[in-house]
């Protein structure tokens, strides 16, 4: 699945706004994930998962930074996230379905934080982009 030029433009232009709030968005996305899908907490037994904890904020920053890497390398997302894919497949052994759950939580967070920018067209573009990211992150599982 490849992104159209219009979709890429939407992703890159929204990223300029998102990146200014990256840490907050990452934290909020993870809080949403753990609240909506508590089974995902099993991958973080050593974390303080209370809302706003330092560990939650730090990991949220990493998650959004990885999305930023994908945006910056939108024409080579596979290359940008290859090491992250290997980490999650071979070392952390994260169930691939969790990437879709996380993507959904990020979409909800973006819609809540950027209601004027998150049009139906933007929603579709971000959904497709995050599907590509999820696919890249799970390709090492095969």
Swiss-Prot record:
Modified residues (Phosphoserine): 53, 73, 82
Domain Globin: 2-142
Short name of any one Pfam family annotated for the protein: Globin
Subunit structure: Heterotetramer of two zeta chains and two epsilon chains in early embryonic hemoglobin Gower-1; two zeta chains and two gamma chains in fetal hemoglobin Portland-1. Heterotetramer of two zeta chains and two beta chains in hemoglobin Portland-2, detected in fetuses and neonates with homozygous alpha-thalassemia.
Any one of the GO CC terms: hemoglobin complex
Origin superkingdom: Eukaryota
Functional description taken from the UniProt entry: The zeta chain is an alpha-type chain of mammalian embryonic hemoglobin.
Tissues and organs where the protein is expressed, per its UniProt entry: Detected in fetal erythrocytes (at protein level).
N-acetylserine: residues carrying this PTM: 2
Gene3D superfamilies: Globins
Protein name: Hemoglobin subunit zeta
Keywords, alphabetical: Acetylation, Heme, Iron, Metal-binding, Oxygen transport, Phosphoprotein, Transport
Family the entry assigns: Belongs to the globin family.
UniProt xrefs under SUPFAM superfamilies: Globin-like
PROSITE patterns reported for this sequence: GLOBIN (PS01033)
Annotated residues for binding of heme b: 59, 88
A molecular function GO annotation: oxygen binding
UniProt-listed GO biological process terms: carbon dioxide transport; cellular oxidant detoxification; erythrocyte maturation; hydrogen peroxide catabolic process; negative regulation of transcription by RNA polymerase II; oxygen transport
Modified sites of kind Phosphothreonine: 29
